[in-house]
């Protein structure tokens, strides 16, 4: 399965806008958490999302654009297909 991480920037947004974005992204199958190889789940930074599946990068970008557009007219998005990830300082989900 392919793995993707995305980041969304809502321009001139309020905190509530990001809550709405989180809901839209979750409805589209994205998660705000990432699982480590040791089984621990970590919270991603604000407006970063994770998804795995039989997906194409271009399709992931379109879904993210649609979610962002449903919240704000002005936004920036990036979607990356990755083979692995490493991190520091993310908070474990309890």
Per-region residue spans from a language model:
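Short glycine-rich or small-residue beta-strand-to-loop segments that form or flank ligand, phosphate
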Residues: 5-9, 50
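C-terminal structural segments of small proteins and small subunits
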Residues: 66-91
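Short, intrinsically disordered low-complexity segments
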Residues: 31-73
């Amino acid at each position: 399965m392919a793995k993707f991480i995305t980041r969304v920037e809502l321009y001139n947004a309020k905190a509530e806008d990001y809550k709405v974005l989180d809901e839209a992204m979750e409805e589209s199958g994205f998660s705000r958490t990432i699982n480590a190889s040791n089984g621990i789940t970590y919270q991603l930074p604000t407006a970063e999302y994770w998804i795995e599946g039989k997906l194409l990068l271009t399709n992931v970008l379109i879904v993210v654009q649609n979610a962002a557009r449903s919240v704000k007219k002005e936004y920036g998005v990036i979607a990356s297909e990755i083979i692995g990830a490493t991190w520091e300082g993310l908070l474990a989900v309890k």
